[in-house]
Amino acid sequence: MFRSHGTDTPREIWNFGEKGTMFYDAIEKFIKLRYHFMPYIYSLAGAVHFEDYTIMRSLLFDFPEDREARTVENEFLFGPSLLICAVTEPMYYGPESTVLNREKTWECYLPAGTIWYDYWTNEKYEGGQYVKVEAPIDRIPIFVKAGAIIPVADGLVYAEQEPEKPIQIIVYPGADGEFVLYEDEGNNYNFENGAYATTRFQWKDAEGQLLNGRREGSFPGMREAVYETVIVK
């Protein structure tokens, strides 16, 4: 995930200004966010290989009974837990670099039947409604489903890098949930021969308890599993 494409057009971050400028800093922020989510993304990629999973999902995949979700064309689910509201209109500059003076907010639909957390503020919203949220250039509207268990890591700068700190297991209360963390060597195809490990996490909302399942499997160079649990308030 996360690779810009084009023909005879600039794609590298340094083509969009210098560090400290609006566009450069926005791109850098989301590059770092992508690596922050790498344990989550990598686990979903494992599910794609082993279970024919779909990472980028129409809202109807998970909310087939929500009629309003059928009309939403600029949102998608990223795995089971994240709702991404793509900003599909220019907010800063128009044709020929004309400056646009418009509100930096975006309206998002939150599917019914669950609670949603604003990823940036942790504010909670009931599903089944449209909400207007801040959407400056460095903040794509992202919502997290109640019951989500999201593994993240700090300090990563490439996909197969081993985290220096324990993987954080972020829990968003409000419903039961589960997530399977997938791990392998990260730089070869040994997983096709069984060299990988999975760990199932379960959140019991009524008890406020996160269950850490047994780590199943192994691969060369596998480190001892150490996790840090964070419960979002």
Each predicted region: which residue ranges?
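Accessory, solvent-exposed terminal regions and/or long lumenal/extracellular loops of proteins
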Residues: 137-233
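Catalytic-domain carbohydrate-binding cleft regions of carbohydrate-active enzymes
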Residues: 1-138, 181
